[in-house]
């Protein structure tokens, strides 16, 4: 079982007892807390994407927006704050759920008269099941790609730190 799955399982566990002989659910929760000390945005992103906890969405969006402002300044882009906020929000939404809204990630069109799929590929995503980032943002694709990569990097750092904490625990 991977680190993400183990942490997700620990978060819904009813048994938070400590066991000195083996790793228990509480150890994985501790590890995520330790990992959050070095990578707090990674924990926010984990909660948003994998734990489906949208309570920190506004705070996460503010963080993504501030990253976008800094990078846009370094790239010397002339973009309004409203457009930059929209780009940050669309990039975050795409990062959290990149699946095609038309086919719900299945890649095929649904029959309108029955709860089943047709053999025709989805016209929105061309059978991929997910939409490319270009479809989520209107302009400044390079900035959006950088933001998505930064989100992946923060998430990866958080997972690696949590995994290391459980291995050395």
Question: Can you say where each PLM-predicted feature lies in the sequence?
Answer:
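Short, flexible helical or helix-coil boundary motifs
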Residues: 14-15, 52-55, 68-76, 95, ...
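The −1 position to Zn-ligating cysteines in a subset of zinc-ribbon hairpins
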Residues: 99-102, 121-124
């Amino acid at each position: 079982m991977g680190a993400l799955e183990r942490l997700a399982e620990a978060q819904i566990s009813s048994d938070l007892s400590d066991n000195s002989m083996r790793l228990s659910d509480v150890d994985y929760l501790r590890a995520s807390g330790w990992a959050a000390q070095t990578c707090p945005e990674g924990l926010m992103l984990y909660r948003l994407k994998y734990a489906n906890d949208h309570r920190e969405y506004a705070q996460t969006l503010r963080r993504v927006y501030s990253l976008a402002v800094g990078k846009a300044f370094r790239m010397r882009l002339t973009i309004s704050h409203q457009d930059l906020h929209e780009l940050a929000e669309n990039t975050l939404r795409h990062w959290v759920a990149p699946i095609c809204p038309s086919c719900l990630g299945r890649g095929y069109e649904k029959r309108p008269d029955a709860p089943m799929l047709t053999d025709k590929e989805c016209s929105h995503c061309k059978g991929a099941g997910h939409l490319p980032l270009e479809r989520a943002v209107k302009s400044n694709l390079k900035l959006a790609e950088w933001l998505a990569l930064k989100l992946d990097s923060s998430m990866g750092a958080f997972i690696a730190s949590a995994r290391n904490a459980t291995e050395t625990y």
